[in-house]
Amino acid sequence: MAPGEVVYTGNGVVVQDLDGDGNWQTGWSILYMHVSSWERVAVGTYLEAGDQVGHASCEGGVSTGTHLHFARKYNGEWVLADDGLPFVLSGYRAHNGESYYEGYLENGEKTVTANIAGNYWTRIIRPESRAEFFYTPTPRK
């Protein structure tokens, strides 16, 4: 997603520090949630944008199916998708919904709405990698 060092891994979680001080409570950090322990990136690994962090799973909390969550923090505070700086994932810009789990991604003419059911129809696959992002295709408004 962005260049930075992996500073923590745990039950379904990977935390990446983006400012290089090794402390994910200062500056920018990215949290990846529901990451499988199988082939998960190790603490101390420096990632570049596009590097694989691990595999989607149900680890790290209650889940009805394999999926991933991404979040960002600045100085230890959660930053919303639409808060100031856009959150862009492989060309898809994230937007807040009216409540939790109701956001959407937008990339040109494509609009992808969050779907709590998450199934085959709720994914984006980057052809150049094994990484998958889950979505439900919906017509653009």
Residues covered by each model-derived region:
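Short, surface-exposed secondary-structure boundary micro-motifs
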Residues: Q52, S57-C58
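Acidic, glycine-rich catalytic/binding loops that coordinate metals and/or anionic ligands
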Residues: A42-E48, A71-K141
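Conserved beta-strand/loop element in small beta-rich adapter and peptidoglycan-binding domains
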Residues: M1-P3, L47-E48, Q52
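Generic serine detector
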Residues: D17, S29, S36-S37, S57, ...
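Zn2+-dependent peptidoglycan hydrolase active-site motif and core
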Residues: M1-V43, V62-H67, A71-R72
